[in-house]
Structures are given as structure tokens and as C-alpha cells.
């Protein structure tokens, strides 16, 4: 850092050209010696390129100086409208240190980049690399999924076993089946028994009827065949033996 200062006389603007790689910081402007203090106002002007700006206004009575913070890296011009004295501008000079890894060429390249490419360049850093989970997490996920499958299978088994409460109804049926039926009345028992007796009688009657038939069998004298009735024997004799005679 190096002190810098300049005197600007009445009606004589001063042009200041910073050295290459140097910045000029203007921090204060003040009026010179003034014999007549009647509250006269003194505007201060600064011109940079084609722009002529008012830096501030001093007063011989109330505002003999003002503080500012202006930095110039190229040629500029200072002036004022006070015709009774000089105005002094002071400040300091510092080297124009550019950030490391950054130059004017890079700045020009960035300005030439199209807006679309700039948007892509901005969008790319947003993409985050996919996080790789450790194998332990995979095993835990598998165990969790197995646990879920077991829970699902248990849920299905429980759902399949839910219809079992219907068993009490079947037990009631079994209870009804096992319970002894009401005793059958004597009349019904007799009615149920009598058909058996009649069947036995029928069977017995047939057997009795068959025995006389077997006793009344007749045999043919010529061929010694037996017949159950005489009519059968007669028809046999007519058919067999009468034709032979």
C-alpha cells in the first residue's frame, strides 16, 4: 500500500492515469485555505470515459471535507467549480492482484460461452454420484425382505387358519349325531318287527311248498327222467315215447 494525493486548482481539471497493475483508492476530498467563509458550496466532479459524475459537494462554512471510497483501475479526471482555492484529493495505491487461477483470457472465454452451454455447465455439478451402499446394508435389506416374506407367509397362514372357527358347528352336528335318539315307541317297534316275521313266514311257506313238490316227483319208466308233475310226464311221453311207438 502506498499513499497517493493530488491538488486540483481552480479551473484546471487533473487527469490521473494509474500505472499498470495498480489501483488508486480515493478516500477523501477537502478544501484548501479559504479566507472568506460565507457558506459557499463547491461541487466536485469525476469523469471516467464519457461519464461525468458528481462526486459530492463541499461547503466553506459547514463541510470543508468529505470521505469516500472510490477505486480506479484506468484513467479518470477530477475537477471542481470553486474559483477561490484548490481542492485536495487523497487516498492510496495498491497492486491489482488477480485471484489465482483466473486471468483476463479466461474471463473472455467465459463471456463467449453461449447461454445454453453455460446452463449445461451449471447443471452438471448438480448431478451427484450414486451412493454405493455397503454390503452390510444389502444383507440387512435381504434379511428385512426375508422377514417381510416370513411375515407375509405367516399372515397367509393365519388367513388360511381363520376359517377354523366353523368347527364348533360341526362339533354340534357330531354332538347331535352321538346323542341317543328318542326311544322308539312300542307300536313302531312292533310294526318294524312284524315284516320280518311275515318275510320269515313267506320263506317258510315256500320251503313248505317246495317239500311236497320234491315228494311228488314222477319218473319216466322208459328213460328214467324225473318230472315235478304228472302233466309234465304226460307231455314228455307224448313228445318222446309216443312218436317212438
From Swiss-Prot:
The ranges of region (Required to repress transcription) come to 2-5, 101-162
Compositional bias (Acidic residues): 103-113, 137-162
Q: Which GO terms describe its molecular function?
A: histone deacetylase activity; hydrolase activity; zinc ion binding
Record flagged with keyword tRNA-binding: no
Note the InterPro entries from the entry: NPL, Znf_C2H2_type
BP terms from Gene Ontology? chromatin organization; DNA-mediated transformation; polarity specification of adaxial/abaxial axis; root development; seed dormancy process
User: Does the record bear Hydrolase in its keywords?
Assistant: yes
* Disordered as annotated region, ranges: 99-245
Which keywords accompany this UniProt record? Acetylation, Chromatin regulator, Developmental protein, Hydrolase, Metal-binding, Nucleus, Phosphoprotein, Repressor, Transcription, Transcription regulation, Zinc, Zinc-finger
- Zinc fingers classed as C2H2-type: ranges: 218-241
The listed locations are:
Nucleus, Nucleolus
Modification Phosphoserine, positions: 211
Question: Gene3D superfamilies this protein is in?
Answer: Nucleoplasmin core domain
Chief location: nucleus
Tell me, what does this protein do in biology?
Probably mediates the deacetylation of lysine residues on the N-terminal part of the core histones (H2A, H2B, H3 and H4). Histone deacetylation gives a tag for epigenetic repression and plays an important role in transcriptional regulation, cell cycle progression and developmental events. Required for histone H3 'Lys-9' deacetylation. Involved in rRNA gene silencing in nucleolar dominance. Seems to be implicated in the regulation of genes involved in seeds development.
Annotated family: Belongs to the histone deacetylase HD2 family.
Q: What else is known?
A: Loss-of-function mutant (antisense inhibition) induces increased methylation of histone H3 'Lys-4' and hypomethylation of DNA at rDNA repeats.
Q: Under which name does UniProt file this protein?
A: Histone deacetylase HDT1
Lineage of origin: Eukaryota, Viridiplantae, Streptophyta, Embryophyta, Tracheophyta
